């Protein structure tokens, strides 16, 4: 299973992103491939929140278009919503305690815990994920 961080979703969609070409190509391959994609709600919510924000984008995506994009991802046969399970709280709190992170990295710890709990790889362009022990993650913009 591959779990995408919100920055992967944004870069795959935003043609003006410096990582768009590489990540969009990778994302299309993943969506059309055999690997299961676990889409967490936090990544979907973040995508819609950010891509529609006029303070971030000069020409923000409309809410309707952002929803259509998210629905198109969820309609793929290899995509499923991934949710916290019974071990999530222990893994999540353990990551916070062992790394000393919180604040802006709290959501990153949540995503790391999801990936660890589900035996998944996390896809992100954010190097902050390197600080979480036992997390398997990669940057699809540089993955060969």
Language model regions located:
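Acidic active-site catalytic centers that drive phospho-/nucleotidyl reactions
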Residues: 5, 108, 126
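Short beta-strand segments at enzyme active-site cores
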Residues: 38-41, 82, 125
């Amino acid at each position: 299973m591959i779990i995408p961080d919100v920055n992967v979703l944004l870069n795959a969609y935003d043609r003006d992103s410096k990582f768009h070409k590489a990540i969009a190509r990778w994302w299309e391959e993943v969506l059309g491939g055999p690997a299961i994609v676990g889409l967490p709600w936090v990544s979907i919510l973040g995508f819609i929140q950010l891509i529609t924000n006029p303070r971030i984008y000069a020409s923000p995506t409309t809410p309707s278009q952002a929803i259509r994009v998210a629905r198109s991802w969820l309609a793929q046969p290899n995509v499923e919503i991934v949710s916290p399970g019974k071990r999530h709280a222990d893994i999540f709190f353990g990551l916070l305690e062992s790394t000393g992170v919180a604040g802006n990295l709290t959501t990153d710890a949540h995503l790391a815990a999801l990936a660890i709990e589900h035996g998944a790889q996390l896809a992100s362009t954010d190097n902050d994920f390197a600080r979480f022990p036992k997390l398997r993650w990669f940057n699809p913009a540089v993955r060969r």
